[in-house]
Regions:
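Structural WD40 beta-propeller signal
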Residues: 130-132, 175-177, 221, 231
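Beta-propeller blade signature
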Residues: 98-104, 150-155, 199-212
Length: 241
């Protein structure tokens, strides 16, 4: 409410409901241990989940008609999440039930429509929408059996693979830069994580032109770089192991 004022009219109500839930779970005064039953705790957790969903969906920043998302089957290997010493190239190349979808309107009863579905069993993820909203980047297995970066128009047309000249290199997790170029991670410099005997191929940051050319290595880390994201001031935020 302090940030959005009248655009978020129920902010105080959400805070009050949160405080009531916290009070329900608080131990009695003078006691170091909670005495609530498992049923009471489970009920409070369910109420907290409902409150969280309601409060977040009411955020004015979600005041748009469509939401781009990845739908992944719950039987996907590792849910498509590598271990914390790995990156995408350590994931299985099959066993997924993925697709890029659009939710409209953006609410629980909105309709999901498929924008892109890869070949059966393939992973698709790391979606990054262009500033214009007219196209997007994403990662999946390319035509040479390696992880590659693809671009797709927002209407589902114009699929093209941007990386993949080298037969033994994986590239993924890309984002658009304000100058039109693309930042991404790649295993092209052939480094492995030492504490797992090198079997986790390290991906670090690279940059390329919009068409996939003029690739330049930006980081020379021993361990992984993950999730590059452009901030509002043009700087790049990323995670590193």
């Amino acid at each position: 409410t302090a940030t959005f004022g009248p655009r978020y009219p129920r902010g105080k109500e959400y805070r009050q409901r949160l405080e009531l839930l916290a009070a329900k779970l608080a131990p009695p005064e003078g006691s170091r241990e909670a005495v609530q039953s498992r049923e009471a705790v489970a009920q409070a957790q369910a109420e907290l989940l409902d409150l969280s969903r309601e409060a977040q969906l009411a955020n004015p920043l979600l005041d748009f008609d469509k939401l781009l998302l990845v739908r992944r089957g719950n039987q996907a290997p590792k849910l498509g999440l590598p271990q914390n010493w790995q990156s995408n190239s350590s994931l299985p190349q099959s066993g997924f039930d993925d697709e890029i979808m659009v939710l409209s309107p953006v609410r629980p009863d909105g309709q999901l429509s498929t924008l892109f579905r890869p070949r059966p069993g393939q992973f698709v993820g790391d979606v990054d929408l262009h500033f214009s909203s007219q196209k997007m980047l994403f990662s999946m297995i390319g035509d040479n059996g390696r992880w590659q970066i693809f671009e797709l128009n927002s209407d589902g047309s114009g699929l093209r693979q941007l990386t993949g000249e080298q037969p033994d290199v994986d590239s993924y997790d890309a984002c658009y830069l304000p100058d039109g170029r693309i930042l991404f991670t790649s295993t092209a410099y052939f480094v492995g994580v030492p504490c797992v005997y090198g079997n986790s191929h390290v991906a670090t940051l690279y940059r390329m032109d919009a068409g996939g050319g003029n690739i330049r290595q930006l980081c020379f880390d021993q361990e992984h770089d993950w999730c590059p994201t452009v901030l509002n001031n043009g700087r790049v935020l990323y995670s590193r192991w």
